[in-house]
């Protein structure tokens, strides 16, 4: 996806320090202090324009949410949605997923959402996929024993790749749907991409998984 560069995005984000965390590394191990409570922290990696993470924060005030999107020109749209949602349990961060361990302490994150991640279809780009074992190693360190990864995509190839990657990593698959919108699953909050692709008749794939610590 080609992103239109917005040279003013960084300044706009920094105008809202109550939402946008400019230096998340400063709060490693201290995110409960950022939110002012002991509620669990959930993160979405690749938040895009923020429809999902804002919707989740509004629907679940007892959970703290952090939307992570490395492109500031995209994250600024998530900022607008966060402002509109008018919630106190949402923060936004501009960082690459490879740097998550610089921002969060071991076991500090209760749940991770991966929604419509870039499929990186070329074989030479496999390591860039957010469900690649390199990233799974990072997630395993961030999540506590009961922590889960929730993954949604419209891309069948990426979903099949992820099923194999999770299984080979010895993860436990606790939920799998090959057509989410025609399943019994309740409480789904759609992303912008999800609305777009489902409107065209594409099935949405979803799974939940956790690490087998035994």
Swiss-Prot record:
Binding positions for substrate per the UniProt entry: 122, 154, 191-194
GO molecular function: tRNA (guanine(46)-N7)-methyltransferase activity
Pathway: tRNA modification; N(7)-methylguanine-tRNA biosynthesis
Known EC number: 2.1.1.33
SUPFAM superfamilies: S-adenosyl-L-methionine-dependent methyltransferases (SSF53335)
Keyword Metal-binding attributed: no
Catalytic residues as annotated in Swiss-Prot or TrEMBL: 118
CDD domains xrefs: AdoMet_MTases
Keyword annotations from UniProtKB, A to Z: Methyltransferase, S-adenosyl-L-methionine, Transferase, tRNA processing
List of residues binding S-adenosyl-L-methionine: 44, 69, 96, 118
Known catalytic reactions: guanosine(46) in tRNA + S-adenosyl-L-methionine = N(7)-methylguanosine(46) in tRNA + S-adenosyl-L-homocysteine
InterPro entries, A to Z: SAM-dependent_MTases_sf, tRNA_(Gua-N-7)_MeTrfase_Trmb, tRNA_methyltr_TrmB_bact
GO cellular component, one term: tRNA methyltransferase complex
HAMAP family hit by this protein: tRNA_methyltr_TrmB
Family the entry assigns: Belongs to the class I-like SAM-binding methyltransferase superfamily. TrmB family.
Biological role: Catalyzes the formation of N(7)-methylguanine at position 46 (m7G46) in tRNA.
Record-given protein name: tRNA (guanine-N(7)-)-methyltransferase
The organism of origin for this protein: Listeria monocytogenes serotype 4b (strain F2365)
Gene name of the record: trmB
């Amino acid at each position: 996806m080609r992103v239109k560069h917005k040279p003013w995005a960084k300044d706009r984000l920094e105008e809202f320090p109550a939402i946008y965390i400019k230096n998340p590394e400063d709060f490693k191990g201290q995110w409960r202090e950022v939110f002012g409570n002991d509620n669990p922290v959930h993160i979405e990696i690749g938040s895009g324009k923020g429809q999902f993470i804002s919707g989740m924060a509004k629907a679940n005030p007892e959970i703290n949410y952090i939307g992570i999107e490395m492109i500031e020109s995209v994250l600024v749209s998530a900022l607008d949605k966060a402002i509109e949602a008018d919630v106190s349990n949402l923060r936004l961060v501009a960082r690459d997923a490879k740097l998550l361990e610089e921002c969060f302490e071991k076991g500090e994150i209760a749940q991770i959402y991966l929604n419509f991640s870039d499929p990186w279809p070329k074989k030479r780009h496999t390591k860039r996929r957010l469900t690649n074992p390199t990233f799974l190693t990072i997630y395993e360190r961030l999540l506590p024993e009961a922590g889960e990864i929730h993954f949604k995509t419209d891309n069948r190839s990426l979903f099949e790749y992820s099923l194999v990657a999770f299984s080979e990593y010895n993860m436990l698959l606790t939920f799998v749907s090959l057509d989410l919108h025609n399943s019994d699953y309740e409480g789904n909050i759609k992303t912008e991409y999800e609305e777009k692709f489902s409107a065209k008749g594409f099935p949405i794939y979803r799974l939940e998984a956790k690490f087998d610590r035994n």
